[in-house]
Structure formats: C-alpha cells, structure tokens
Amino acid sequence: MKKAEIGLIGLAVMGENLALNMESKGFTVAVFNRTAARVDAFVSGRGMKKNILPCHTLQEMTESLECPRKIMMMVKAGRAVDELIEQLLPLLDKRDILIDGGNSHFLDTIRRAQYVESKGLLYIGTGVSGGEEGALRGPSMMPGGSPAAWAHVKTIFQSICAKVEDGTPCCDWVGENGAGHFVKMIHNGIEYGDMQLICEAYHLMQTLLGLSADEMHQVFAEWNLGELNSYLIKITGDILAHKDG
C-alpha cells in the first residue's frame, strides 16, 4: 500500500477540511482522531473513496507515513499539544517533522520547537488563516520553526494555500522558532482592529445617519473600489445586501 505524504491529527472541521484540501491536490493523507468513531465517520462520509488513510492509533499513523514523517496537529491550543507531542515522540525517528497548525501562543511554540529539536526532530508552528472555508479551498499559511523542515513541507503547503491573482502562493517561510504563530498573532490583531472599525462605521451610519441596509451596502461597495479594498469590507457589503427569505 502506498504510504501517505502527510498525516493529520484532529478531525474537527478545520482538520477535516485541510485533509480534503491536501487530498484534492494529489497528496495521500493519513488521518487520526482521539475518538476512533470520528475517523470512521470521516472516511465513510466526506472522505469516502479518497486517498485518505484512516488510522485508529498513533502507531498506525506513524507506520503509514513516508519518511521523513510529516504530522500536522490540529488540536486545541495549550496542554493538548504538549500531551500529543509526548505521545508521538517515542514513535518517531530523527528528522521527522511535527507541525502545529492550531492557534498556539508563539512563546509556547518557541518552547516546543526547542524541546522537539533537542530530541533530534524538526518542528513547525504555522498560522492558518481563512477559517473553515479557507481550510478547504485555500488558507493563508504562515509557517515558522526548524528551517530544515521547510523543504519537506513547502510543496504541500504552497499547493493547498490560497493564491493571489498572479498565482503567488499565500504561504512562505517566516522565520525560526515561534515566528509563524507570532505572525498569526499580529495578523489577528490587525484583523480584529479592522473589524472594530467596520462595526463603528456601521453603527454611525445606522444610528446617526439613519441609512438603510441597502444604502450602507452601497457605501461599503464604493469603499471596496478604492484604497479600502479588502475581504472584510467586501463581505460586510455582501451581508448588508442579503435579504432574509
């Protein structure tokens, strides 16, 4: 049986969608979830008849991967990541690669990268932006960590990520240690600031100017034609144009 190019642990919606995205780009993906029923439900549902290998133990997953093994962890940030790393280390060989695709704090990622590297393995902490739909259709990705790991995951990451109009991938190496999760933190801070500004603009237009939803849609649509052009401005305009059935 062909071995998988990458393994993915954690089959919540983000994990499922990333696995489907990778498979759609021609990669064979081994998947594992703490509850085996979730694995079975995935491969008999959305993952049916796809190049996805169901694994019911971590050992089964590690044995199903080509070397150097690449394992992406899509689990809740915090203690769960540390516990999973400890479970995986005895099953892995030197130069295998662990990837944290969750929203870990960059200081935790620095600590984990140093710890994993001290065991002879490589570590990547990557920001993944775009939510559930982005995970399926193309997220923005911000990988950082062990520099030697990048060559092994670059093709996969740049295949599944979003692309700008000229085809440039929305993914590149951002630095060592916790750089990937640091960049994601800054990205989120900017995004939440933009969202607050949009909320305030909406509030002023609605309460002070008395504009209707259609009129506010026109304002946001015009803003999106100029220097304020952005995904958030666009979807705000789209929401205001939506009519409930």
Model region roles, listed by residue range:
Residues 36, 58, 78, 106-108:
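The beta1-alpha1 cofactor-binding region of Rossmann-like NAD(H)/NADP(H)-dependent oxidoreductases
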Residues 60, 70, 80, 111:
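Residue-level recognition of oxygen-bearing side chains
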Residues 81-85, 99-100, 105-217, 225-245:
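Rossmann-fold dinucleotide-binding core
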Residues 72-87:
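Glycine/threonine-rich flexible loop motifs
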Residues 11, 32, 73-74, 101-102, ...:
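Glycine- and other small-residue-rich loops at beta-strand/loop junctions that grip anionic moieties
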Residues 1-69, 91-95, 132-135:
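NAD(P)+-binding Rossmann beta1-loop-alpha1 motif at the extreme N-terminus of oxidoreductases
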Residues 66, 76-77, 146:
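Helix-capping/helix-break motifs at membrane-protein junctions
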